[in-house]
Amino acid sequence: MIRTMLQGKLHRVKVTQADLHYEGSCAIDQDFLEAAGILEYEAIDIYNVDNGQRFSTYAIAAERGSRIISVNGAAARCACVGDKLIICSYVQMSYAAARLHHPKVAYFEGENQLQRKAKAVPVQVA
């Protein structure tokens, strides 16, 4: 049995650019890609915290250290500069591997400052 699991997550990054006329994709600072284990050209799902939009595209690398999150092409209609996003990638694996799997999660605040990294999403308390 194959399971689809969270592989990497950029939590609450801020959109710095939205370019409707750029060829598709989402440009992400190379440091951020590495923090979440997301590869260039990997499929990603994006969840817009500010407007509730959910959409899929692929990651491309932005300049290392630039703190850029640029939503491009048709996806630019789903996010505005300043919106907070959750960007996720997923991986498929066997049930046995999934039981041992830990995602790479990177948490951000302010102007895309990396606050911390984790290998799990915290348990939600009542």
Curated annotation (Swiss-Prot):
Single biological process term from Gene Ontology: pantothenate biosynthetic process
Recorded superkingdom: Bacteria
Cellular component, GO annotation: cytosol
InterPro entries reported in the protein's UniProt record: Asp_de-COase-like_dom_sf, Asp_decarbox
GO molecular function: aspartate 1-decarboxylase activity
Catalytic activity: L-aspartate + H(+) = beta-alanine + CO2
Cofactor annotation comment: Binds 1 pyruvoyl group covalently per subunit.
Main localisation: cytoplasm
Quaternary assembly: Heterooctamer of four alpha and four beta subunits.
Protein name: Aspartate 1-decarboxylase
Organism: Yersinia pestis
